[in-house]
Swiss-Prot record:
Protein name: Large ribosomal subunit protein uL2
Organism annotation: Hahella chejuensis (strain KCTC 2396)
Cytoplasm among keywords: no
Gene Ontology CC, one term: large ribosomal subunit
GO molecular function: rRNA binding; structural constituent of ribosome; transferase activity
């Protein structure tokens, strides 16, 4: 996909770097596979802000994505590729031989007219969804389940992928892009290939308004606030004179907050392991 740098016709266009894809569908999404998406502006049921920096943005329709890929043995054809405002990856509309249509995360390299299959007997090619027991060791995969039948949870964003590095007994070991090595049950499904739109990380929005269109509100530095609003607030000049903390007083910048979980035993190697 071409990466386009715009001419500086205005201050807001000067730094914009866009990623274009001429093969994407220009029209509306399939109505039967869309749902209403209600925004909450980062507020909970009491109206209090629970997630900062959210609010506004363009109205969006949610595209219902098939993360389970359960139509085994029924061949499908890629009818079109589409933009999805709810994720960084592109999506593909599949038309199955029985007439049903479903959206999936579009794998890199898949184009309109390509055949897509799922199930234990699916061919080993990009876009096929199989249990990990049927995927050759060394293969690059995405949209990986963590529990059999729950649906894909790992490696779903633009350009994401993982590699099957081993298979022993009931578990397969996958290496994530972060460097983490993780065990997953061999009954869990994964899709061959990597996720489309890998150039997404090259995109430069160019102005604050482009983030506001996406529902992202400004982030104010704690040192620019008053003492009543943040532990870093107040004082003369720019120094806040203490160890950096969050707005709620928890140490930050290196302080570990992750609690141990039952599933830690599935992590073979941490992403930050030396």
């Amino acid at each position: 996909m071409p990466v386009v740098k715009t001419k500086p016709t205005s201050p807001g266009r000067r730094h914009v770097v866009a990623v274009t894809n001429p093969s994407l569908h220009k029209g509306a999404p399939l109505a039967s596979l869309t749902e209403k998406k209600r925004k909450n502006g980062g507020r909970n049921n009491a109206g209090r802000i629970t997630v900062r920096h959210q609010g506004g943005g363009h109205k969006q329709l949610y595209r219902v994505i098939d993360f389970k890929r359960t139509k085994d043995g029924i061949p499908a054809v890629v009818e079109r590729l589409e933009y999805d405002p709810n994720r960084t990856a592109h999506i593909a509309l599949l038309k199955y031989a029985d007439g049903e249509r479903r959206y999936i995360i579009a794998p890199k390299g898949v184009s309109v007219g390509d055949a897509i299959a799922s199930g234990q007997e699916a061919p080993i090619r990009v876009g096929s969804c199989l249990p990990l027991r049927n995927i050759p060791v060394g293969s690059v995969v995405h949209c990986i389940e963590m529990k059999p039948g729950k649906g894909a949870q790992i490696a779903r964003s633009a350009g994401a992928s993982a590699q099957v590095v081993a298979r022993e007994g009931a578990y397969a070991t996958i290496r994530l892009r972060s460097g983490e090595m993780r065990k997953v049950l061999v009954e869990c499904r994964a899709t061959l290939g990597e996720v489309s739109n890998s150039e997404n990380n090259l995109r430069v929005y160019g102005k604050a308004g482009a983030k506001r269109w996406r529902g992202v509100r400004p982030t104010v530095r704690g040192t620019a606030m008053n003492p009543v609003d943040h532990p870093h607030g107040g004082g003369e000049g720019r120094n806040f004179g203490k160890h950096p903390v969050t707005p709620w007083g928890v140490p930050t910048k290196g302080y570990k907050t992750r609690k141990n979980k039952r599933t830690d035993k599935m992590i073979v190697r941490r992403r930050k392991a030396k």
